[in-house]
Regions:
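Catalytic Walker B motif of ABC-type/P-loop ATPase nucleotide-binding domains
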Residues: 155-159
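Conserved ABC ATPase signature
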Residues: 130-134
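Conserved ABC ATPase "signature" region
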Residues: 99, 103-126
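ABC transporter nucleotide-binding domain
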Residues: 173-257
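Conserved catalytic motifs of ABC-family nucleotide-binding domains
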Residues: 151
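Short, charged/small-residue-rich alpha-helical element at the C-terminal edge
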Residues: 226-297
Length: 297
C-alpha cells in the first residue's frame, strides 16, 4: 500500500483556470519525497486536495489507503500538513494551542508527546508564551508542532523553512529526519533546492498543473551531470571553445562541460592560445541546474 496515491487529479476553478491537469503519482511508506515547482505550478492546490480543504474536479487521492473524500476522517487522521502561510491563534500559548489541536483529533492525555514536540522544535522556553508574541520563525515552528500533534504517518511540509534562521533549519531537519527513520512518510515542497537534494529519496516536479518529472534524486542528477566552469580571462575565448559557452551576467566566461576531460582540453587550449586564466571557479551540476533545465522545456 502506498502512503499517498494520486490518480488523474484534475482541478478546474469556476473561472475555467486548470490548476491541476491529470496529475498521477504514488509515494511509498517511509519515503522522503519532494514535490517541486515554480509558483503557480499547482503544488499548494494539490496539497489542499490531500488535506480535504478543496475538492478535485475529478480524480482520486488516497492517504494510507483512505480516500480523502469517501473516508475523510481516517484520511485526515493519517495526514499532518504544515501550510505555507503563517496561521496561528493569537489568544493561546504554544502549549494551549497544541492541546486544543489534540482535542480536534479526539486525543486525550497527549501531554507527553506535546512535551517531546516542544523540546525537539526548540520551543521549550516559549511553551507558555502567547503565540502572537512569537517571531515569524517561532510561529512556523508552532505550525510544524500542530501538524505533528496527532502522530500522523504522513507529513506534508509546504515551505517549512521559509523565513527560518539557519540554526533552526538544521534542528528542524534533524527532527524531521528522525521521524522519517521511525517510519513516517515525509512530503516536502521547498524553494531551497539544496534541501530537497540532500534530504529526499525521490523528486517530482510540476509545471502549470502538470507533472513534468518524477524520478529518484540520484537519477535526476546523473541524467544532467556536468560541470560549470566560470573563468576570468586575460584575452578572448578561442573560437573552438565557444560551443560550450553559456550566457553570463558579468565579465566572466561561463562554460557548461560534460566532464573533467573536457575541462583539461579547455585549459590546454587556453594555454596554447596564450590566454591567461586569472580566476577559475568550478561547480558540479546540482538539483538547481536540473530544475531550471526541466522548467525551460
Amino acid at each position: 500500500m502506498s502512503a499517498l496515491h494520486i490518480q488523474d487529479a484534475v482541478k478546474t476553478y469556476a473561472n475555467g483556470f486548470p490548476a491541476l491537469r491529470g496529475v498521477s503519482f504514488d509515494v511509498a511508506e517511509g519515503e522522503f519525497f519532494a514535490l517541486l515547482g515554480p509558483n503557480g505550478a499547482g503544488k499548494t492546490t494539490l496539497i489542499s486536495a490531500m488535506a480535504g480543504l478543496s475538492r478535485l474536479t475529478s480524480g482520486r487521492i488516497r492517504v494510507m489507503g483512505h480516500d480523502v473524500e469517501a473516508d475523510a476522517y481516517a484520511a485526515r487522521m493519517s495526514l499532518g500538513v504544515v501550510p505555507q502561510e503563517l496561521v496561528f491563534d493569537p489568544f493561546f500559548s504554544v502549549r494551549e494551542a497544541l492541546q486544543f489541536q489534540s482535542g480536534y483529533f479526539g486525543l486525550k492525555n497527549n501531554d507527553d508527546w506535546i512535551d517531546e514536540i516542544i523540546t525537539n522544535l526548540g520551543l521549550a522556553d516559549k511553551a507558555d508564551t502567547n503565540t502572537r508574541n512569537l517571531s515569524g520563525g517561532m510561529k512556523r515552528r508552532v505550525m510544524v508542532a500542530q501538524a505533528l500533534v496527532h502522530r500522523p504517518p504522513v507529513i506534508v511540509l509546504d515551505e517549512p523553512t521559509a523565513g527560518v534562521d539557519v540554526e533552526l533549519r538544521q534542528s528542524l531537519w534533524a527532527f524531521i529526519q528522525n521521524l522519517n527513520r521511525q517510519g513516517h512518510t515525509i512530503i516536502l515542497t521547498t524553494h531551497y533546492l539544496e534541501e530537497a537534494q540532500s534530504l529526499c529519496d525521490r523528486i517530482a516536479m510540476m509545471k502549470q498543473g502538470v507533472l513534468v518529472a518524477l524520478d529518484s534524486t540520484e537519477h535526476l542528477l546523473h541524467a544532467e551531470k556536468g560541470l560549470r566552469v566560470e573563468l576570468l580571462l586575460e584575452g578572448a575565448l578561442p573560437d573552438n571553445l565557444r560551443a560550450w559557452q553559456q550566457p553570463s551576467n558579468d565579465d566572466t566566461v561561463l562554460l557548461k562541460l560534460d566532464d573533467y576531460e573536457q575541462l583539461a582540453f579547455v585549459l590546454q587550449t587556453l594555454k596554447y592560445a596564450g590566454v591567461k586564466v586569472k580566476h577559475m571557479q568550478l561547480t558540479e551540476t546540482d538539483l538547481e541546474d536540473v530544475f531550471v533545465k526541466i522548467m525551460r522545456k
